[in-house]
């Protein structure tokens, strides 16, 4: 499962169609089941797409996101963001 708990999921995949790692952040209007270990539905999703030949960068990005989401203040701020402009500005500062 890519559900990591506390309403957060980090689905990740390596694909041949890209040459740089991409991270997408989704703040869902309605939480969904990601089979998280704590059984909580997910409302915050970080999607990682990495090139097939880029194992180290893929793991580094996954590790970085994992570190950020351990910070309760960071997660609380994410949940308070109301629109795409606020999300963009938030990640521009982080």
Regions found by a protein language model. Give the residues of each.
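Cytosolic covalent-transfer regions centered on His/Cys nucleophiles
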Residues: 1-94
């Amino acid at each position: 499962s890519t559900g990591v708990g506390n309403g957060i999921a980090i689905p990740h995949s390596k694909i041949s169609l890209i040459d740089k790692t991409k991270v997408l952040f989704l703040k869902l209007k309605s939480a969904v089941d990601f089979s998280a270990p704590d059984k909580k539905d997910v409302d915050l999703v970080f999607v990682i797409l990495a090139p097939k030949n880029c194992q180290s960068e893929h793991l580094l990005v996954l590790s970085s996101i994992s570190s950020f989401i351990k910070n309760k203040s960071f997660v609380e701020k994410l949940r308070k963001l109301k629109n795409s402009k606020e999300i963009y500005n938030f990640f521009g500062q982080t």
